Amino acid sequence: MNTRIERDTLGEMHVPQDKLWGAQTQRSYENFHIGTEKMPMEIIYAFALLKKAAANVNKKLGQLSAEKADAITWAANEVLAGKHDDHFPLFVWQTGSGTQSNMNMNEVLARRGNQLLQEKGLDVTIHPNDDVNRSQSSNDTFPTAMHIAAYNKLDDHLLPTLQMFKQTLHQKAKQFDDVIKLGRTHLQDATPLTLGQEISGWARMLEKTEQMIRESMIYLQELAIGGTAVGTGVNAHPKFGEMVAADIANETGKPFKSAANKFHALTSHDELVHTHGALKALAADLFKIANDIRWLASGPRGGLGELIIPANEPGSSIMPGKVNPTQSEALTMITSQVIGNDATIAFAASQGNFELNVFKPVIIYNFLQSTTLLTDGLRTFHDKCLIGLEANETIIKKHLNESLMLVTALNPHIGYENAAKIAKKAHAEGLTLKEAAMQSGLLTEEEFEKMVDPAKMVHPQG
């Protein structure tokens, strides 16, 4: 492999000739070659956006020449366009402040910026620290990138997918609004409801969690940039943080703003804990929905069999004709991972010793993983299961007609104890409720049929 010599404050490093990074990135790559988890590209792009804004503001403040600022901007735009993805090789498992990833971006933008300047015949040299990182520290840039990446991932990907999923649930609720089925509580038969009513409950769950996510995202709008090393803003213009946040807001069209207290912004990540808590709530809801569908589709002959799910693939390598609830299984595994990620994020966020939290990479890695998994899981479940979900009305009607819990409709007419006697007699002697009621001498056939009407039970009139 052809290499070139790059230098930092610790000495010389051999760097691959065709790579844009420098000595500090190379050191990190060699010192922290751990696992397979690379720094998420969402963070890389957030960094590029931040460095572009910082260069623009430094130019406005007279801290950076127009030639250097423009070259950094050009290079950052190339990164944002995905042209240099393979020049960001670092792993999540590095310094807890994310310094190596900050320097990775600084070095790539400096070298690429210098190449662009040379192409224009300009005798100007960009330095990764003095120019690209001017007025900044890893301690305020990395948390800024964390918030940008998290907010964008939620706003651009998860929330639109969640809205699509929710809309289809509403459509299914309307489609099955007239299908009266047996209700179940405690895994036991209960009074009836419509399948549409049951699904409407699922839709409302997602409406609430969507609202929780949106409300929590307000805190992610606050950016740490301008705090520099410990929150005081040393080596930065007093207006730098505010101006950079405004530039990022203008560039993205999203309501980013400068954090009111930079000391908090560097040492605490309670905003991400709070927002991920909403993601955990979404995960809990999705587990329940996927699990209900899985159980209601169980069978086809030995289970509940009230729902029919699409047959997407053979279900067994040994049992022919088997169709498994694979989309439910995938989604429930995803939600389990998200709930586990929440524990990691909460613990990591507690490690804000003095002026700086030093678990930043693992916090944002898990946050972005949760968001990606939920987005992909929602879309796949929607496309491969939810849209094609059908009601097995024959089985639904059979279960409803055999239910002893229809006896609940008799409570207002003959009292709880008499109704219970009818249910027990029917169960013990294998009778229908009507037969048990008539044999008990409590009701005539006409009275029973007037009082026990599932359609009236799902839409009571008082």
Swiss-Prot record:
Give the main location: cytoplasm
Residue stretches spanning the membrane: none
Q: Name one GO cellular component term.
A: cytoplasm
For this UniProt record, give its keywords in alphabetical order, as a comma-separated list: Cytoplasm, Lyase, Tricarboxylic acid cycle
Q: In which pathway does it act?
A: Carbohydrate metabolism; tricarboxylic acid cycle; (S)-malate from fumarate: step 1/1
Which SUPFAM superfamilies has this protein been placed in? L-aspartase-like
Hey, where's the site called Important for catalytic activity on this chain?
329
Q: Which residues bind substrate?
A: 97-99, 127-130, 137-139, 185, 317, 322-324
Give the quaternary structure: Homotetramer.
The record's similarity note reads:
Belongs to the class-II fumarase/aspartase family. Fumarase subfamily.
Q: What is this protein called?
A: Fumarate hydratase class II
Native organism? Halalkalibacterium halodurans (strain ATCC BAA-125 / DSM 18197 / FERM 7344 / JCM 9153 / C-125) (Bacillus halodurans)
